[in-house]
């Protein structure tokens, strides 16, 4: 089933309440119809999905059957091969993870845009480090700060373009 046929709206992620699974709530829209809602308390249980009305329950059942007919996902985890069945719950959980990652990427992008004019940004793996110009916003000063960043994080990538 195409992802754009199933959309989560009114999405709320509660990171502070996420323990073993993601704690969230969202309306589930199928084919432009507000079919129901999904929620997970974040305690390690499965995602609960409920229809708002008879048509919503029918659409959720149809979506569940369509997704259930899809091949399972095979992943490698800690040296083992795992088979994850295609279910509506797993599909919605994956949408949730993508939405959270998209939000985090946007947050990082905005932070970088804000900080670039005032300092050097060094990316080291998944981490970002900020080195302010202070009074060294000259070509020599910038190079000095880049050298400090490279000394502290030898494999880092400098995101500034001069």
Each predicted region: which residue ranges?
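Terminal leader/tail segments of proteins
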Residues: 1-162
